[in-house]
């Protein structure tokens, strides 16, 4: 087990290093400059490039960035908040992005499990077809479309919740963004729960339990549902990270000061350091969660660990 965990950690670190290198190359190829909007002469721009080390070869900048990153230094902002440490900017905004993601995950998990269980227990009925149709629609509709519909009908027409984020009422301001983000995970969890629960209900040991005269609700709650939810739980980690990493447009729509909106501002203003740092933080969160899921899979099912170690 220790060998398996060590190998997964090394692979994750190598993946992060490759991602960081790709981000550097992409930022280097991007047109424009963080100093384009300023009324500066070419000589002044050259001085700024030299000040921030942007005149150095990409390899030198990459190695210096990695060295500084190991000490927690992600550089400073060039355009959004000049000379302000990016690590501080991210730490101020990361919490609200995580909160929105967790709220969306809670909503998606509750309604996804309900839809999936109801669908599986009424397999091949009109209820199953209705739940499946709702799941397909949920997967198909982008979160930003849901956000715009919620803004118009719930916030503008019914005036139940504010459209834009308000620090005085943070919780109510995050309800609509969380609901918009929860549509896709609701559908995915519902489909996954339905599939797993149907497989479990058709398994031999469930048929054996039924033959012993165990009541249906006890059989479902104590045996079928418990076994069906093990694979579902393992996919919730990546779904949560996807919610946080995919909330950039939602944060812009609702004016939420999260890391997603910060990354979009960095792209719009050619703030290389901000864009790289935000993208890297998202990547690190996703890979860390996938690492945890891999380890959990290895603990839950040793066959997975053995097969990966053999490779």
Language model: regions and residue ranges:
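N-terminal signal-anchor/signal peptide hydrophobic helix marking the start
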Residues: 6-15
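Hydrophobic alpha-helical segments of integral membrane proteins
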Residues: 9, 44, 48, 58-74, ...
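Membrane-embedded alpha-helical segments of multi-pass transporters/permeases
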Residues: 16, 20, 24-29, 144, ...
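Hydrophobic aliphatic residues
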Residues: 26, 30, 38, 70, ...
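An internal, D/E-rich "acidic patch" concept
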Residues: 55-113
């Amino acid at each position: 087990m220790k060998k398996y965990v060590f190998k997964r950690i090394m692979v994750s670190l190598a993946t992060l290093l490759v991602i960081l290198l790709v981000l550097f190359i992409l930022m280097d190829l991007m047109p424009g400059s963080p100093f384009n909007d300023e009324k500066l002469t070419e000589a002044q721009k050259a001085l700024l490039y030299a000040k921030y080390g942007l005149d150095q070869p990409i390899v030198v900048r990459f190695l210096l960035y990695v060295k500084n990153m190991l000490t927690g230094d992600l550089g400073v902002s060039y355009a959004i908040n000049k000379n302000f440490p990016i690590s501080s900017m991210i730490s101020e905004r990361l919490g609200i992005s995580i909160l929105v993601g967790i709220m969306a995950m809670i909503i998606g998990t509750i309604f996804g499990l309900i839809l999936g269980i109801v669908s599986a227990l009424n397999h091949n009925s009109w209820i199953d077809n209705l739940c499946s149709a709702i799941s397909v629609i949920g997967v198909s509709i982008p979160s930003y479309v849901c956000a715009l519909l919620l803004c118009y009908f719930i916030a503008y027409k019914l005036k139940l919740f504010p459209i834009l984020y308000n620090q005085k009422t943070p919780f109510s301001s995050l309800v609509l963004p969380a609901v918009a983000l929860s549509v896709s995970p609701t559908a995915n969890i519902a489909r996954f729960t339905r599939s797993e629960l149907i497989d479990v209900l058709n398994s031999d040991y469930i048929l054996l339990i039924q033959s012993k005269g165990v009541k249906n609700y006890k059989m479902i709650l104590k045996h079928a549902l418990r076994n069906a939810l093990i694979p579902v739980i393992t996919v919730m980690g990546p779904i949560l990270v996807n919610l946080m990493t995919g909330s950039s447009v939602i944060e812009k729509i609702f004016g939420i000061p999260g890391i997603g909106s910060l990354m979009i501002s960095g792209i719009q203003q050619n703030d290389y350091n901000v864009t790289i740092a935000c993208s890297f933080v998202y990547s690190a969160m996703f890979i860390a969660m996938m690492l945890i899921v891999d380890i959990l899979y290895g603990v839950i099912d040793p066959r997975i660990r053995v097969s990966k170690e053999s490779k």
